[in-house]
A protein has these predicted regions:
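Conserved short beta-strand elements that form part of the metal-binding/catalytic scaffold
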Residues: 27-59, 104-110
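Short hydrophobic/aromatic beta-strand element in the GNAT-like acyltransferase core
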Residues: 38, 46, 62, 82, ...
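Vicinal oxygen chelate
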Residues: 78-112
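Mid-chain, well-packed structural core segment of small domains
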Residues: 61-86
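N-terminal beta-strand motif that seeds the catalytic metal site of vicinal oxygen chelate
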Residues: 1-18, 59-61, 111
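Short glycine-enriched loop/turn motifs at secondary-structure junctions
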Residues: 1-3, 53-58, 88-89
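Short secondary-structure junctions
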Residues: 25-32, 82-86
Length: 112
């Protein structure tokens, strides 16, 4: 069975939020319309950012990657610092970022 993931993050003002997401994830894969763009993280695995003011700030997405340090180092190099770093009892690590609307985007990785 093939699996595709399309997670959506809601923001108050897409045009105001877009520069942060470009800095965070790079250029988007495509614009769905004037107030929504899609970032493809891997084949069939995407994050969409859409203007929905009534739901802004309530999204939480965690993406598990094999190369957590590489992902986080790239984001930090582009000028965005994580808001939290955690290591769970089983060694799994999670690094959390928050966009200007308060949405949580986390990256998890395997134990070192």
């Amino acid at each position: 069975m093939a699996l595709a993931l399309f997670a959506e993050i809601h923001v108050r003002d897409f045009q105001a939020a877009k520069p942060w997401y470009v800095q965070f994830l790079g250029e988007s894969a495509f614009a769905a319309h004037d107030t929504e763009e899609v970032w493809e993280l891997a084949e069939n695995r995407s994050i969409a950012v859409e203007e929905q003011p009534e739901n802004a700030g309530h999204s939480a997405v965690t993406v598990f990657v094999d190369d957590l340090d590489t992902w986080v180092d790239g984001i930090v190099a582009r000028g965005i610092e994580p808001t939290k770093r955690e290591t769970y009892d089983n060694g799994v690590r999670k690094v959390t970022f928050h966009d200007p609307d308060g949405n949580e985007i986390g990256f998890g990785g395997p134990p070192l």
